[in-house]
């Protein structure tokens, strides 16, 4: 069984570096996309969102409740 395991490891050896580089590249891309999204949302002021009086009242009530807790 040990000989089969050694053959398996030898067969995988040439692909380890390429697989690692690919995995790191995909991970870096995913992290960069997430970081960029957070950055863009953080700088948005949401001034273009229309607030109805009912919604403003509900938000004020929720803020008061969260301050009490």
Curated annotation (Swiss-Prot):
Membrane-crossing segments per the record: 20-42
Topology versus the membrane: Single-pass membrane protein
Localization of this protein: Mitochondrion inner membrane
One Pfam family cited in the UniProt record for this chain: Coa3_cc
Function: Required for assembly of cytochrome c oxidase (complex IV).
GO cellular component, one term: mitochondrial inner membrane
Protein name listed in UniProt: Cytochrome c oxidase assembly factor 3, mitochondrial
GTP-binding keyword on record: no
GO BP annotations listed: mitochondrial cytochrome c oxidase assembly
Residues in compartment: Mitochondrial matrix: 1-19
Induction entry: Differentially expressed during meiosis.
InterPro entries named in the record: Coa3, Coa3_cc
Subunit structure comment from the entry: Component of 250-400 kDa complexes called cytochrome oxidase assembly intermediates or COA complexes.
Alphabetical UniProt keywords: Membrane, Mitochondrion, Mitochondrion inner membrane, Transmembrane, Transmembrane helix
All ranges on the Mitochondrial intermembrane side of the membrane: 43-69
Family: Belongs to the COA3 family.
């Amino acid at each position: 069984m040990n000989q089969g395991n050694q053959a398996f490891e030898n067969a995988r050896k040439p692909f380890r570096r390429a697989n690692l580089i690919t995995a790191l590249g995909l991970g870096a891309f995913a992290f960069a996309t997430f970081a960029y999204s957070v950055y863009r949302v953080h700088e948005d002021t949401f001034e273009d969102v229309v607030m109805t009086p009912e919604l403003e009242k509900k938000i004020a009530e929720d803020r008061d409740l969260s301050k009490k807790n």
